[in-house]
Each structure stands twice: as structure tokens, then as C-alpha cells.
């Protein structure tokens, strides 16, 4: 992670660090493809935490622009997924370390830019395991050629949600993106 205190001597602009990290990840993805890997999932909690105004303010206070993250940052991540022969998934979560989350809010704030700019990704894996995830309406912004994986089962609870509740949530999501996707 970029830190104004520790990173500035090497990276005056946080997006320079992000671009260098993406170069490393892209090289690793190419090597995995060369070895026969056909699916790579990139975890991008930054996009998930931007749904929360408090997290946006925190990042802005560190000098990491929300607007640049949703444009240049998405483009940087998208460049990682430009390896032929590999299906790429983009996992957008809101944090889950030791069953603790770090952001609350729906995807309305980020959906338009993240989904439309992530052209090299084939699959979006989205956290929807409780009410703080917001409505399914932002799924309407997922391009037609993309697959959506709904994270409906919570890893934060000791018990699995009842099947009828999960089916009802799938049916609700299907109002915005077809079940076949």
C-alpha cells in the first residue's frame, strides 16, 4: 500500500506505485498462462471500499484521489488482465479479515466506472452477503458479455444462510442481470 510518509521518496504519485505493481502482476499472470493456467482472479478491495464515504475521505486524506482510482486505477488493474488464453475474474469485496468488514454501502458509486472500464475481465465476483452490501440495482451496469458471481453466503457467520433465502436473493438479482450470466 502507498503511504505518504514512507512511499514518497520512491513514488511521489501513488499511481506510479500502482502501475509498477501492475507490471509485476501482469508478468506473473503471463508466466502462469505459459504454465497452463486458464483462470486468474485479481482481488481488488480498493474498488469495494470506495463505496463507503468514510473510506473515500480517508484515501483522499492520504493523497489518493477517488476519481483517479475509478479511472486510472481501474485502467491499471484492467491492464493486468490482458493475457491471451486466460479467463480473468475481478473480485471486489469490502474487506473480510477475521470476519471483520471495512466498508459499507452499495456499488452504486463505483459500478458505472469499474464495470465499463474493466474490459479485459470476464467475471465480476461481488460481495452481497448482507444488507450493508446494498441493492442489486448496480448489476444493471454490468456489460452483457460479463459473468457475475454473487457472494451471497457469508464467511462472517458460523451458519449457512437458509436455501430459500439464497434463492430469493438470486431471483432478486436476476431482475438486473440474467441467471445465465
Functional labels for PLM-detected ranges:
Residues 1-181:
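Domain-level signal for soluble alpha/beta catalytic cores
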Amino acid at each position: 500500500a502507498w503511504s505518504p510518509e514512507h512511499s514518497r521518496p520512491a513514488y511521489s504519485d501513488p499511481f506510479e506505485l500502482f502501475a509498477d505493481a501492475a507490471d509485476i502482476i501482469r508478468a506473473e499472470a503471463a508466466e502462469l498462462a505459459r504454465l497452463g493456467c486458464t483462470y486468474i482472479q485479481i482481488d481488488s478491495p480498493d474498488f469495494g471500499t470506495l463505496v463507503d464515504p468514510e473510506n473515500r475521505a480517508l484515501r483522499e486524506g492520504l493523497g489518493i484521489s477517488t476519481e483517479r482510482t475509478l479511472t486510472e486505477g481501474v485502467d491499471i488493474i484492467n491492464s493486468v488482465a490482458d493475457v491471451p488464453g486466460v479467463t480473468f475474474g475481478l473480485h471486489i469485496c469490502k474487506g473480510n479479515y477475521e470476519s471483520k468488514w471495512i466498508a459499507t454501502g452499495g456499488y452504486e458509486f463505483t459500478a458505472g466506472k469499474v464495470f465499463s472500464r474493466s474490459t479485459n475481465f470476464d467475471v465480476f465476483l461481488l460481495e452481497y452477503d448482507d444488507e450493508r452490501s446494498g441493492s442489486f440495482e448496480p448489476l444493471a451496469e454490468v456489460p452483457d458479455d460479463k459473468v457475475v458471481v454473487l457472494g451471497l453466503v457469508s464467511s462472517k457467520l458460523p451458519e449457512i444462510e437458509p436455501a430459500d433465502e439464497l434463492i430469493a436473493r438470486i431471483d432478486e438479482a436476476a431482475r438486473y442481470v440474467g441467471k445465465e450470466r
